[in-house]
Amino acid sequence: MARVKRAVNAHKKRRVILERAKGYRGQRSRLYRKAKEQLLHSFVYSYGDRRKRKGDFRRLWIQRINAASRANGLTYNRLIQGLKAASIEVDRRMLSELAVNDAAAFAGLVKLAKAALPADTSAPVAN
């Protein structure tokens, strides 16, 4: 049986790993073993952060909605409660877009939510 030399494959494999590790600091971009370890960790971080990003955006939307609704005299909690009572199905992403880009439309939604809320004197009032 003929002898198979694998130098070409090995060099290509190492070159691909080192090319993907460009931009890393120190040995992590220069030495094959360190670069390979760092790439494996990078893939794990990427996977986890793609899922984390969804929660990050939801938190951002809620902060924007809360700020805009407080400017209109209602807390975030009461706004969501009022929108549900008024049977208005608008998700937080759309609400935050309205709050940032179309303040008049957002104010209209706040007005509808206020009208749908039960008259509760113990509810907190936004400053």
UniProtKB/Swiss-Prot annotation:
Domain of life from the UniProt record: Bacteria
Keyword Manganese among record annotations: no
GO BP annotation list: ribosomal large subunit assembly; translation
Pfam families reported for this sequence: Ribosomal_L20
A single MF term (Gene Ontology): structural constituent of ribosome
InterPro entries according to UniProt: Ribosomal_bL20, RIBOSOMAL_L20_CS, Ribosomal_protein_bL20_C
Gene Ontology CC: one annotated term: ribosome
SUPFAM superfamilies linked to this entry: Ribosomal protein L20
Coiled-coil residues: none
PROSITE patterns reported for this sequence: RIBOSOMAL_L20 (PS00937)
Alphabetized Gene3D superfamilies for the sequence: 6.10.160.10, Ribosomal protein L20 (1.10.1900.20)
Keyword annotations of the record: Ribonucleoprotein, Ribosomal protein, RNA-binding, rRNA-binding
Family: Belongs to the bacterial ribosomal protein bL20 family.
Function description: Binds directly to 23S ribosomal RNA and is necessary for the in vitro assembly process of the 50S ribosomal subunit. It is not involved in the protein synthesizing functions of that subunit.
PANTHER family linked: 39S RIBOSOMAL PROTEIN L20 (PTHR10986)
Protein name (database record): Large ribosomal subunit protein bL20
Natural source organism: Renibacterium salmoninarum (strain ATCC 33209 / DSM 20767 / JCM 11484 / NBRC 15589 / NCIMB 2235)
